[in-house]
Amino acid sequence: MSNNIEKVAVLGAGTMGAQIAGHLANAGIPSCLFDISQELAEKGVGILTSLKPAPLYKPKNIELIEACNYDQHLEKIKEVDWILEAVAENLEIKHKVYTNIMDYLKDTAIVSSNTSGIPLADLTKVMSDEVKKRFLITHFFNPPRYMRLLELVKGPNTSDEIYNKMASFGENFLGKGIVHGKDTPNFVGNRIGVHGGNNAVRLAIEMGLTCEEVDKLTGTIVGRPKSGVFRTTDIVGLDVHASVSATSYNNLPDDEAR
């Protein structure tokens, strides 16, 4: 099967951006991993050698990832077939990043966001109609090498051809199971996950349970990952969990669980 996504730019060398670049490397796909400074970009690449569970299938795969920064290396974006944004869950920051890269996109380049739940309609407000045709949500879950789920969300302007291409690429080259979501608050996975997690915290407080007790009750004993509610939240990051929770709260005023 042919693959015409030969090189990727990952914008944001934090927890998810670096690991997504690592998973691309596992599939033999080179990437440029960007951050606001060269030091942060190199730190993102370097951390892939020490994270547990290991993000890289083979240690040498790290050679496929090039650390880059926005001040010196934006020209490299002209070389890539897919630009994946994985910066902080802050709409203003995401808009700034999109604006900075627009002049460097080649006409066929696909652009996507790894947002945990910010509406696609909000993300694309700073994009031209032409770029909107090539934009979609590609939401990986942490850790991306091991979590099979990949959520895809398209907007009203997204090309069906590009959307289907990314679904095929995710399944056949990255080994993902594709969930096709709609542009609703937090899409599918986090809409369910943040509701269940926050409800478990509420019940724990009411019942006087410890974090350890909750994780035992919400882990393998009920057929879920051993991390349970609190450890999963810790892995995801409290800042990300708070952002995802706020997305649901702010955009679902009539939800019965509000």
Feature roles, as predicted:
Residues M1-R258:
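N-terminal glycine-rich phosphate-binding loop for ADP-containing cofactors
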